[in-house]
Amino acid sequence: MQKNNPRLFGTNGVRGVFGKEFTLDLVVDLSYSLATFFGKGPIIVGYDGRNSSPILSKIVRSVINSAGIDVGNAGLVPTPCLQYAAKRLGYNGGIMITASHNPPEYNGIKPTANDGVEISREDELKVEDIYYSKRFSKSDSFGRDFTDETIIGSYIEKVLSLVNVEKIRQRNFRVAMDIGNGAQSRVAPFLLNKLGCKIITLNGNIDGDFPGRGSEPTPENLKMLSNMVKDSKADFGVAYDGDGDRSLFCDEGGTVHWGDMVGAAIVRYLLKTKHKGAEVVCPINTTMALSLVAKETDSKVIHTKVGSVEVSREMLRRKSFIGLEENGGFMYGKLNEVRDGAMTTALVLEMLSLSDNDDDHNNKEQTLSQIISSLPKIFQYKTKFKCPTKQIANNIVTICLEHGSPKKIETLDGAKIWIDEDTWIMVRPSGTEPFVRMYAESVDGSLLNSKVAEYRRLIESRI
């Protein structure tokens, strides 16, 4: 890449405020760059429910067609469906128009390789080099643009083949589902219907303004889902982000759990049943509970930098079937090594339906809250701070590294500061938004609160 040019790619693709930093000129040139990078087709293009997504899809497809490459139009689909198509339906790559959990004014482009995973960090640099040098491939012929209506049906059938459908149907689960006005409205309700679930939906219509709640599901903005679970006596609730690759779960009592805790429960289930001794790949900001669960089953946890691309690519390198992030992104490699909210929901249903067969569960059906409570007890805290510049964000990381007398420091990504063997604070600049993110864990709730307050004061004094 040419020197002094700013990075286009963040943690997950290229994103920005549409019409501001994410301009039509950028979209056109980036599309030419991707056409040049892929070199041949067909390429599958899909988009989420944001207001600007349909027109951006038309632009991207037209530009790639003009480079002589055939393009399949997936239409409005969750990101995992687009990635599934790129991997399994004969495409040479894929492009998803999405800004995932970002606010409505954002949009973005996420390229996927033909292995179904976002292109690697090295390939991102290759695309950026093409973009800045303007070395675009040209063609005298125009590629074909066609609609692929097989993707969602094929995807759902594949998910069903990976879980015990009969056992799940026998339980007649009631599930409260907050779709968040996002792309999972095209898949999740239909998948759960085939699994025999009674579904109660919230924010089920697609709306790019995300009027029901923010496009990022968090325990703070899922109070309506929590109440719906309790009022409807549902077995659990699930909420998806804007493009449907992440999911947060609410237990039958209305408590919303962070993604890595439910993820740890799924991991324990998989390690004890389908994938004994398997490696688990996750970012460095993931819960300590995961390592403790893996230790129970003589398994191993591999840590990466933060970002689903980092986790997915490491899963491919190590041939691992299990990966996850703390934000509700769970990856099941038997389908694809990417985050997938619908696949995760199916795994939770299977975990609950088969819990009575686990010796550790005393041969009784268990609720989600009982399964979560049986995990190692960890207190968690997560927040983010608005940060005006990347320089200030980087300075905050440095200041935190130099603060106090920690037991150990890890700098794989940002600063992970170990107060003692069972307590840590992590600070890192967001790769998708103008924030500094803070994560903290401890087995001691009082110590956690004290250290969180200490580091909050330190960070807020520098912003």
Feature names for model-found ranges:
Residues 1-68, 93, 145-175:
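An N-terminal, well-structured beta->alpha segment
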Residues 1-4, 17, 107-232:
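Gly/Ser/Thr-enriched, mixed-charge loops and adjacent short helices
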Residues 32, 36-37, 43-107, 160, ...:
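N-terminal small/polar loop signature for handling phosphorylated ligands or for N-terminal nucleophile
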Residues 81, 125-157, 161, 252-324, ...:
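Proline/glycine-rich low-complexity loops and linkers
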Residues 92-106, 229-251, 256, 301-340:
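Glycine-rich phosphate-binding loop
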Residues 120, 201-203, 255-274, 341-350:
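Gly/Ser/Thr-rich active-site loops/lids in small-molecule metabolic enzymes
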Residues 275-463:
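Phosphate-binding and adjacent anionic-ligand microenvironments
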